[in-house]
């Protein structure tokens, strides 16, 4: 492989640290996604990077070691007492040729883009830095910016890191003053502020020699305070270049993460919790799905007069209800193509929750996406202690066959006024959603 820049002859080795134990999702490295262990998806992504000459998995667990070796890939057994993934990688790096370039790829990133790896390696090969790492846009207030598990990074005009933190940074001072000194309110009302934030992605590129030097340094004050080992490098004067990821990756830390990644790999659909910035697309899907799916069923003038802005305002107001949730389904460049929202029932009966809306654009119906979204919503309800579920549907709705397929039974009837006409509706119920 030809490498350009300061070190044209150095080989590039991707090392993937993989532990079996995990506090939130034990054994995740071997959990199957589309019939293949998670760790092997990460291996294949790393192997697809054009700048990478060799891929190794570094593990202390024989089960992971055997799974990787049996797949025809390289694995190395390491000591069990390493305090971090960097130390595990350093043990492997000791046996690599001097001048090697090391890529630290997190084992629980089965969607890491090969292009992201290439971008980071190419930045390292240009020289002048000690470490290259990766960032991507931050888009969610509560799920990301205020989440201490999501590490934020700020960098200078030259692209070099200034600081990493679990706290939100930088601080939107002027915007906060416009909203009574409340930065959260500022971010809720001025979503364009999010372009100033970056989320750190835990991929690193460094020379073999710098890695060995780094792991021999004692822990530093800020590193221990924030529990972020990259601060040890900054506190010791390292130059860390930050490059943008090519596409978003998803680290698998929870069962919900695993389900999301599985849907993407198996079906190409990304089902996730809705964010504030999704609501305009959601309102558009709501109106368009009605206009296209219910043509000939409800009056044309009612469909023509449906307002996306009114739907958008309604969804924005509902977001403040602590018992309200929304999930969206996104499909590649098409963006959001379906959604569901649910919460405290408005229908009569003894049900714990109600689905208020469940819509997909017609071209994405009968694709299996609806069933995946429905099951994900149900699992989230079960996690929150919900046992039973209801929804209402127009008698003539084309969606009724889907509700029947998902095990719903008709438990009542009602009517809705659409325009100047009354339309018969049916109420579906599920008594035990844990069985869905």
Predicted regions and their residues:
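N-terminal glycine-rich phosphate-binding loop and ensuing alpha1 helix
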Residues: 8-58
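Conserved GNAT acetyl-CoA-binding A-motif
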Residues: 381-393
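Conserved catalytic-core motifs of GNAT/GCN5-like acyltransferases
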Residues: 390-394, 409-426
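Conserved active-site alpha-helix within GNAT-family acetyltransferase domains
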Residues: 371, 396-412
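Short phosphate-binding loop-to-helix
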Residues: 56, 62-122
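Acetyl-CoA-dependent GNAT
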Residues: 273-279, 287-297, 301-363, 374-376, ...
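Conserved acetyl-CoA-binding loop-helix of GNAT-fold acetyltransferases
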Residues: 36-40, 360, 366-379, 404-405
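Conserved core of the sugar-phosphate nucleotidyltransferase
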Residues: 114-220
């Amino acid at each position: 492989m030809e490498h350009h820049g300061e070190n044209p002859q150095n080989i590039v080795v991707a090392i993937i640290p993989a532990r079996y134990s995990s506090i939130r999702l034990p054994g995740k490295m071997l959990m199957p996604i589309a019939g293949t262990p998670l760790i092997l998806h990460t291996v294949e992504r790393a192997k697809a990077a054009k700048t990478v000459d060799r891929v190794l998995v570094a593990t202390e667990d024989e089960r992971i070691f055997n799974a990787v070796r049996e797949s025809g890939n390289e694995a190395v057994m390491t000591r069990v007492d390493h305090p971090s993934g960097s130390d595990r990688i350093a043990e492997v790096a000791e046996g690599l040729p001097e001048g090697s370039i090391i890529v630290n790829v997190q084992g629980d990133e089965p969607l890491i883009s090969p292009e992201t790896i290439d971008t980071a390696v190419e930045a390292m090969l240009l020289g002048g830095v000690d470490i290259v790492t990766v960032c991507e846009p931050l888009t969610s207030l509560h799920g990301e910016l205020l989440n201490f598990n999501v590490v934020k990074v700020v960098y200078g005009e030259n692209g070099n890191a200034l600081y990493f933190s679990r706290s939100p940074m930088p601080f939107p001072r002027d915007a906060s003053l416009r909203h009574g000194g409340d930065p959260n309110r500022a971010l809720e009302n001025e979503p364009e502020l999010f372009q100033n934030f970056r989320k750190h992605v835990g991929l690193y590129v460094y020379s073999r020699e710098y890695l060995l030097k780094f792991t021999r340094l004692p822990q530093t004050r800020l590193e221990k305070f924030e529990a972020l080992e990259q601060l040890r490098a900054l506190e010791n004067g390292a130059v860390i270049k930050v490059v943008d990821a090519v596409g978003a990756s998803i680290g698998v830390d929870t069962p919900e993460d695993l389900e999301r990644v599985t849907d993407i790999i198996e079906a190409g659909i990304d089902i996730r919790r809705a964010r504030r910035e999704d609501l305009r697309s959601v309102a558009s899907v709501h109106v368009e799905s009605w206009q296209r799916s219910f043509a000939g069923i409800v009056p044309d003038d009612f469909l023509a007069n449906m307002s996306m802005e009114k739907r958008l305002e309604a969804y924005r107001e509902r977001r403040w209800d602590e018992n309200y949730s929304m999930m969206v389904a996104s499909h590649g460049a098409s963006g959001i193509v379906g959604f569901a929202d649910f919460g405290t029932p408005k229908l009569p009966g003894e049900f714990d929750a109600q689905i208020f809306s469940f819509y997909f654009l017609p071209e994405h119906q009968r694709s299996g996406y609806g069933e995946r979204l429905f099951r994900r919503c149900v699992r989230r309800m079960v996690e929150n202690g919900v046992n039973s579920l209801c929804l209402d549907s127009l008698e003539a709705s084309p969606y009724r066959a889907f509700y029947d397929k998902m095990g719903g039974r008709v438990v009542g009837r009602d009517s809705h006024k659409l325009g100047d006409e009354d339309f018969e509706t049916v109420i579906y119920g599920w008594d035990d959603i844990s069985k869905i």
